[in-house]
Design a protein with these regions (language model features):
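AMP-forming adenylation/ATP pyrophosphatase catalytic core
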Residues: 1-6, 25-28, 57-59, 72, ...
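Inter-helical turn/loop segments and adjacent helix faces that build the functional surface
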Residues: 159-171
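Internal, active-site/partner-interface "lid" segment
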Residues: 142-148, 168-180
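Alpha-solenoid HEAT/Armadillo repeat architecture
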Residues: 118, 161-162, 205, 221
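Core alpha/beta nucleotide-donor-binding catalytic domains of modification enzymes
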Residues: 1-158
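Amphipathic alpha-helical interaction segments
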Residues: 93, 151, 155, 170-174, ...
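Amphipathic, well-packed alpha-helical segments that form the structural scaffold of globular domains
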Residues: 130, 134, 157, 161, ...
Length: 274
């Protein structure tokens, strides 16, 4: 919990739903007001009968700060923790992923798992806090234009609303839900294709490229490459491996000292230490 309206609303609704709730606060050490945030979250947890736990992580300033802070946060939080992402957060994520050139998974946005507020708007959580006379903390970093998400939130989405002459957030979220259904279907086919990469590459080569690409990404992660969300399997590397699967190359480098080869109708991944 950050002490903002979304996380406070999540706390209240989780308690009202009869769940045994523990409010977790993570201090990233990035701004001086973090102690006040922890106090507010602790007080809110006590008011609504929830337990409270505080965590501290170290996140050095520098590039990719948002992603590194998010990873550090999830590393200390328990598995299955609920988050206060709303419909607005989903729309922002879809647009951010679109600008990064993400594929189907990225355009499907965040998974619904552990996000019980995904059908609510940010205005709903603000209204709930006002009704309960809760005063959320305002994170000044959410207004900092150096962070791309903030520009999407404060500049791009209002511009799209104006151009479309309607609220685009529900439209973006509806499209992401449709794309998630497509992505899940492809994932099922990729699971079946995965075994062929190590046992019979020729069979994998006959499958549609969309399925083989997914199988390649899963295969890489299963073998220790690209597990870190900050460094997922690179799209160009996947295309090079696809060429190996199709016998257009006998091997390829995929970065960071890793290499993929095809031998005896099997795909092999070689780590920098092998």
């Amino acid at each position: 919990m950050s002490g903002g309206p979304d996380s406070l609303a999540l706390l209240v609704l989780a308690v009202e739903a009869g769940l045994q709730v523990t409010a977790h606060h993570v201090d990233h050490g990035l701004r001086p007001g973090s102690a006040a945030e922890a106090e507010l979250v602790h007080a809110a947890a006590e008011r609504f009968g929830a337990a409270f736990r505080s965590h501290s992580v170290v996140v050095e300033p520098g590039p990719n700060l948002e992603a590194r802070a998010r990873k550090a946060r999830y590393d200390v939080l328990p598995a299955g923790v609920l988050t206060g992402h709303t419909m607005d957060d989903q729309a922002e994520t879809v647009l951010l992923n679109l600008m990064r050139g993400a594929g189907l998974d990225g355009l499907a946005g965040m998974t619904p798992y552990r996000r019980p507020l995904r059908a609510l708007r940010r205005s709903d959580t603000v209204a709930l806090c006002a009704e309960l006379e809760l005063t959320p903390l305002h994170d000044s970093s959410n207004d900092d234009p150096r962070f791309r998400r903030n520009r999407v939130r404060h500049e791009l989405i209002p511009l799209l609303d104006d151009i479309a002459d309607r609220d685009v957030v529900p439209i973006l979220v509806r499209q992401s839900n449709l794309l998630r259904d497509d992505a899940e279907l492809l994932e099922e086919h990729a699971d079946r294709a995965l075994a062929n990469l190590e046992t019979n590459v020729a069979l994998a080569a006959e499958l549609p490229p969309a399925i083989v690409r997914r199988a390649i990404r899963k295969w890489l992660r299963n073998h220790g490459y690209g597990r870190d969300e900050l460094h997922p399997p690179d799209a160009k590397a996947v295309e090079r491996i696809l060429a190996v699967v199709r016998s257009e190359a006998v091997g390829c480098d995929i970065g960071q000292g890793w290499r993929v080869t095809r031998r005896n109708n099997r795909l092999r991944l070689h780590s920098p230490d092998s």
